[in-house]
Amino acid sequence: MRVTGRVLFVLIAALTSLGAMSLQRAEQPASDKEIRIGNVMPYSGPLSEFGAIGQAEAAYFDMINARGGINGRKIRFITRDDNSDPATALELTRNLVETENVDLMFGSFGTPGNLATRWYLNEKKIPQLFVASGDEELSQPGAFPWTMGWQPSFRSEGRIYANYIQAYYPRKKIVVLWQNDQFGRMLYKGIQEGLGDLNRLVRVDIAFDIADQHLDGHISILKRSGADIFVFLGVPSTAAKVIKLAASMNWHPVFIVNDASASIANAMAPAGLENSAGVISAAFLKDPSDPAWKDDPAMKDWFAFMDKYHQVESTNNSAAVYGYAAAEALAQVLKQCGDDVSRENIMRQAASLKNHHPSVALPDIRMNTSPHSYLPIRQMRLVQFDGRSWQPFGEVIETAFTEGAAR
């Protein structure tokens, strides 16, 4: 455990039994001296590579506190390890609310854990803000007014890839390798929705588990299908293995990977830059390992932040950039709260963002929310890796989000 300023960074794999504790009322204001923020992350287990999100958020609030806090209040950020287990996520969240008396939960990772805690937090009127998941079920203000997403939705992202395939490769054969969880399913569902009648061109789709030891067998099956387009939907470490395996089999289809895997440092470079050349993705944040941004003022601020407040993590980690951007967005919400940092006003301000541009987001990406719109980021850009850098093409995409959100 480390304590820096007023930020508490705690990594706990499991909790002992919890005593019954009285809950703060939703309208109860935060302390005059601090705002207490709870967070749950997979610092261990199969998705531990995304623990970098929470670590960057902790460091960001260290920086905020070093600069005097927000509206005179310091930030106390308490983050814990759920090992990607929904039951543990619920137990930890209850403890953060009932024992640590957090004012809100922020940025907890993953669809299963956030779905497991959603009912509890809404029942107790605790803000569940900017969850680290693109599942639209976590952005339903009518049913769950205390839960709000942050990143572009998985389904809409999937529709972007489907629209790209229809526009550039309308009669080509497709294969899909997708992660066998809610994350992978929603991405693939978006592709299926976007392809419509062209789903007949999907020759093979294979679901894989995060710890799958048979990737070579999967790639062999996909190659034998004779497909022209290979869509991968999963995490960066697996994307690197898949791209490298395909190249080793002398198979060079049009490669599409999802945004979470579109990291030069975490996926393209480990796969081999030559092997990764030509990979297509969609993005909304700048890749810190992309030399295209080396002179960008916002990325210079990012590197300075990492050097001063977060030296334990690589400056090239895209997951860390995600955490930085999400924490920056929460800081904007808290600034808008002024002196009223009650839970109700925190939600009110979170639902009142107008054209907020995260500093490390791609140009023209904006956050907008309202009481009826809990998907803050509804824009992405198509990008292609040229062996060195991501090259954007086309315009900022919004139409897929309008269509993808329809139910």
PLM features: what roles do these ranges have?
Residues 96-109, 129-131, 173-178, 226-236, ...:
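Periplasmic-binding protein-like
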Residues 82, 129, 136-139, 210-211, ...:
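Venus flytrap/periplasmic-binding-protein-like
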Residues 308-321, 331-392:
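Segments of small-molecule ligand-sensing domains
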